[in-house]
Design a protein with these regions (language model features):
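Short juxta-domain linker segments that transition from a proline/glycine-rich
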Residues: 1-396
């Protein structure tokens, strides 16, 4: 399952999924084994990188944000008890879609004694500031209405669900103390998304609109990124949506956000694949670009990507630029409006991509930036090739 080059009699992904469904404990053990293999691979790369520099550096451990990403990945990016709690509070509080920033401000004051103030004097990049002593929540004036609602809903999670947040974090005894703090914020953000986009209503709208992100954003008064992230969480048993992979990357290929309800693998070393359509979005800012891509394991995915609109920080201010990517297994692509007019059943049209050059075994890739980690590059001074670091002849 985990080898770089699968033999002809390798177990199919369908069989693996069936095994996990029938025996969840086996599935968890497979995930654990795979994670250990991945960590060992990345540790080897770290040792190689340090071999020519400092030899006294302490052993690296996963960063808190990496641990929290694994925390959500292990749960298929769906936190059932928190999702249901947000949906229940939305309904019991008489909330309706539209103008949620105003409705949430009233809810915070009436139910929790928290006064929400729209503040123009917060630090330049601050979005939210809460004082537990005075129970005043300050929200940055420059935020859009949907962004204001999200920040208020995040604080709502922290003041209304502290025990639930702690209980969910406590289910993972592998988290470090620092990671636990990051996980609480991540769970509060999850609650906020689930509150603004209540599961059943949003799930129904997504199917009705064929997952048209712009139309969903307009209906629920939130941004493109918020809709994409919420779509990646629609994995409630008996009411699942399309299992999406959600990513956010910058022009240099650094992935700052990644969540997956699928088996799609992201590399932590050597950057992401330059052939991946998410990088093409920067060449067409504001437009949605699509791609049918195939991974080295043979699985094919449908991807769409779009750049985010920069926040108004003034002409001399520092502007953030990201591309949002949303992908799913090719078998689900026909449910998406973005697959209209695209050939989905011809494998020859799929773009061969990988998780990252250092862990990708495609020896015939002309775009390769690094040699395959653990492989040997054949060097023959009597020949020349247009393929960098080729061929990978064996794995050691």
């Amino acid at each position: 399952v985990f080898t770089a080059t699968a033999p002809d009699d390798s177990v199919s992904s369908m069989h693996i999924e069936e095994l996990v469904a029938r025996m969840p404990e086996v599935g968890r053990n497979l995930v654990t084994v795979y994670r250990r293999l991945r960590d060992a691979t990345e540790e080897l790369e770290a040792y190689r990188s340090h071999a020519t520099t400092e030899t006294s550096l302490p052993a690296e451990r996963p960063m808190p944000f990496e641990e929290v990403r694994d925390f959500f990945y292990d749960r298929n990016n769906y936190i059932g008890e928190l999702d249901i709690a947000a949906e229940r509070m939305f309904a019991q509080s008489g909330m309706t879609v539209g103008g949620l920033d105003v409705q949430l401000s009233a809810l915070m004051h009436e139910r929790f004694g928290v006064r929400v103030v729209i503040d123009a004097d917060l630090p330049a990049h601050a979005k939210r500031s809460y004082d537990p002593e005075t129970k005043v929540l300050r929200i940055a004036q420059w935020l859009l209405l949907g962004q204001r609602a999200f920040q208020i809903a995040t604080q709502l999670a922290l003041v209304s669900q502290p025990e639930l947040l702690s209980a969910i974090v406590a289910t993972d005894d592998q988290l470090t103390p620092e990671s636990r703090g990051v996980a609480r914020i991540g769970l509060a953000n999850y609650f906020a998304g689930a509150f603004l986009l209540p599961y059943r209503e949003f799930h129904s709208a997504a199917a009705e609109l064929h997952y048209d992100i712009d139309l969903l954003a307009r209906r629920f008064e939130v941004g493109f990124e918020t809709v994409c992230h919420r779509l990646s969480t629609l994995q409630r048993p008996q009411l699942r949506g399309v299992p999406f992979i959600f990513v956010r990357t910058d022009k240099a290929g650094n992935i700052s956000k990644r969540q997956s309800a699928t088996a799609f693998h992201f590399s932590r070393v050597g950057g992401s694949c330059p052939l991946w359509v998410v990088h093409d979005a920067f060449a067409q800012p504001g437009r949605i670009v699509t791609q049918v891509a195939q991974m080295p394991d043979g699985r094919s995915y449908f991807w769409l990507a779009k750049t985010t609109a920069p926040e108004g920080q003034g002409y001399l201010g520092q502007h953030k630029s990201f591309a949002i990517g949303l992908g799913c297994d090719l078998m689900h692509a026909d449910k998406l409006v973005y697959s209209t007019g695209i050939t989905l059943d011809d494998p020859s049209t799929a773009v061969p991509i990988g998780a990252g050059c250092k862990i990708c075994n495609r020896s015939a890739c002309a775009q390769r930036a690094f040699p395959y980690l653990g492989g040997r590059v054949a060097v023959n001074e009597n020949t020349g090739s247009g393929l960098p670091y080729s061929p990978v002849t064996e794995v050691v």
